Amino acid sequence: MNKTSVPSPDSIDRQWFLVDAENQTLGRLATEVASVLRGKTKPNFTPHLDTGDFVIVVNAEKIKVTGKKSDQKLYRRHSGRPGGMKVETFKALQSRIPERIVEKAIKGMLPHTRLGRQLFTKLKVYKGSDHPHSAQEPKILSLNSESVTK
């Protein structure tokens, strides 16, 4: 009879991956990164454990969306005060805080539980091509999606 094995926390091998978001489609990049963060690319994936890897996303300001989403997609946040709803388009948020767009897309694809919050801490998003994690020697993660040409 076969037994299901559950990996112990010290047996999980965590790696660092680097993703270049330049000319990548937002949703396609987010699904690949969320899968790596979750650990679904590993043979010892366990749904209730954090078996994923660290992911560094660079060039967040150069991410693309298809269609008219750059003008029509809205990002909402609320201060918690009456009348405190702030609405911003993709284009405006991309010029102001491009990291937030990528973070929000990936966070929405992770579990909405304590595990998802723990997984989200392993995501590092940066504007530009520089990042402070060179000591971890991240591997380049090539995405299956093709780049958007315009």
Curated annotation (Swiss-Prot):
One GO cellular component term: cytosolic large ribosomal subunit
Any one GO BP annotation for this protein: negative regulation of translation
Keyword Ribonucleoprotein among UniProt keywords: yes
SUPFAM superfamilies associated with the record: Ribosomal protein L13
Signal peptide coordinates: none
Disulphides: none
Pfam families cross-referenced by the UniProt entry: Ribosomal_L13
InterPro entries: Ribosomal_uL13, Ribosomal_uL13_bac-type, Ribosomal_uL13_CS, Ribosomal_uL13_sf
UniProt keyword terms in alphabetical order: Ribonucleoprotein, Ribosomal protein
Disordered: annotated segments: 128-150
Repressor found in the keyword field: no
Gene Ontology MF: a single term: structural constituent of ribosome
HAMAP family assigned: Ribosomal_uL13
Family listed: Belongs to the universal ribosomal protein uL13 family.
Subunit-level organization: Part of the 50S ribosomal subunit.
Function noted in UniProt: This protein is one of the early assembly proteins of the 50S ribosomal subunit, although it is not seen to bind rRNA by itself. It is important during the early stages of 50S assembly.
Name used for this protein in its record: Large ribosomal subunit protein uL13
Organism: Prochlorococcus marinus (strain NATL2A)
